[in-house]
């Protein structure tokens, strides 16, 4: 593929391009649907997601997947400090999600007014669209990434390959059930389900994104 801005040629497998395209397409559709969802339903999602993370039965498969990720990463000689899903990380995820649930933000809200007498200038908060994240291999990124739903955005993210099993388990066991329990479209939060680093390039090159955020360093987030 050729980058739209620079024209630089990158080797991105066709199946990776399709995986990214499908994820963004679902997020675009979900963004449109989210505009009709009441704020209370979005808050319910955050609360339900937090509840499921705190539920031992629901969280068990996630811990098992994380142990597999950690074991594989160690066998490859990689650092696992941020990869291992500790009780503190779990608690921080719950706290972050509950914070989003309680935060007094609306998707469409006037934030400032400058009065010039005969006329005025207003600033409004409104949804952006699809927000993309590329993260290193940290399982707690779900609490960070899903925060954009608070103001009516949808999200697509790619996580480092070391944490992909954990991410899949969180998605399947916790995230999707929380979305459905709250009545939100499944496409609201999309994981780019590919271990290929090139998926990050394909994601950030998609013109349908409203905002792209990279967290970390090196080629894993490049």
Residue ranges of predicted features:
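N-terminal Rossmann-like NAD(P)+-binding subdomain of aldehyde/semialdehyde dehydrogenases
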Residues: 1-122
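Well-ordered alpha-helical segments embedded in enzymatic catalytic cores
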Residues: 19, 141-144, 198-199
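Secondary-structure boundary motif
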Residues: 36, 55, 180-181, 205
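Short, ordered loop/turn segments at secondary-structure junctions
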Residues: 39, 160-162, 194, 217-218
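Conserved small-residue-rich beta-alpha loop and adjacent elements
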Residues: 95, 99-182, 210, 221
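Conserved NAD(P)+-binding/catalytic subdomain of aldehyde/semialdehyde dehydrogenases
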Residues: 130, 190-222
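Short helix-terminating capping/connector loops at secondary-structure junctions
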Residues: 183-187
């Amino acid at each position: 593929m050729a980058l739209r801005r620079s024209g630089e040629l990158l080797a991105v497998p066709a199946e990776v391009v399709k995986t990214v395209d499908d994820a963004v397409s679902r997020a675009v559709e979900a963004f449109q649907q989210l505009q009709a969802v009441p704020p209370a339903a979005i808050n319910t999602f955050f609360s339900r997601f937090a509840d499921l993370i705190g539920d031992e039965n629901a969280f068990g498969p996630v811990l098992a997947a994380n142990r597999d990720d950690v074991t594989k990463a160690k066998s490859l000689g990689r650092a696992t400090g941020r990869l291992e899903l500790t009780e503190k990380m779990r608690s921080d995820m719950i706290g972050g999600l509950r914070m989003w649930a309680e935060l007094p933000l609306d998707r469409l809200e006037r934030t400032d007014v400058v009065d010039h007498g005969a006329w005025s200038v207003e600033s409004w908060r409104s949804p952006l669209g699809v927000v993309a994240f590329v993260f290193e291999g940290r399982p707690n990124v779900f609490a960070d990434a899903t925060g954009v739903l608070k103001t009516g955005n949808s999200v697509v993210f790619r996580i480092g390959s070391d944490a992909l099993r954990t991410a899949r388990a969180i998605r399947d066991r916790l995230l999707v059930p929380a979305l459905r329990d709250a009545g939100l479209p499944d496409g609201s939060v999309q994981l780019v389900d590919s271990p290929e680093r090139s998926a990050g390039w394909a994601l950030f090159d998609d013109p349908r994104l409203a905002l792209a955020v990279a967290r970390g360093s090196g080629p894993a987030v490049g």
